[in-house]
Amino acid sequence: MDTIKFTLKEDAQGNKNPILPEGVKNYLIDIDGTVGEDIPNEEPERMATAEVFPDALAQVNKWYDEGHVIYFFTSRTEAHREVTEQWLKKHGFKYHGIIFGKPRGGNYHGIDNHIVKATRYKGKFTDFVLKEATVEVFND
């Protein structure tokens, strides 16, 4: 795994915050049902043999090779760390880390003091295209 290169930017209060270089994205990518077969936590014995989605593997590795930050963000638990890391390695995924314990059930709505973008996976990974959409924001 490559080291992530940040610059420190000072805010109005004098605090230094890590900032990615221009054009570099932080990807948070689900595992089950997104880069491979959808396996529920209740069936961990299937995780080691889950089918990989080849287009997802190619796109994730392309983003990594382009210098983007790749983290898998999964509802799997820490108890699934070993089988998850082995599966990712077996299939050749390039990534910087894994965050376990994502809330289950879907219907996610991210709130952050940084720009947040989300892309719903609908069965195939491709390059992104621009599309106009309505988004929910806080009332100014």
Where are the regions a protein language model picked out?
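HAD-like aspartate-dependent phosphatase fold
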Residues: M1-D140
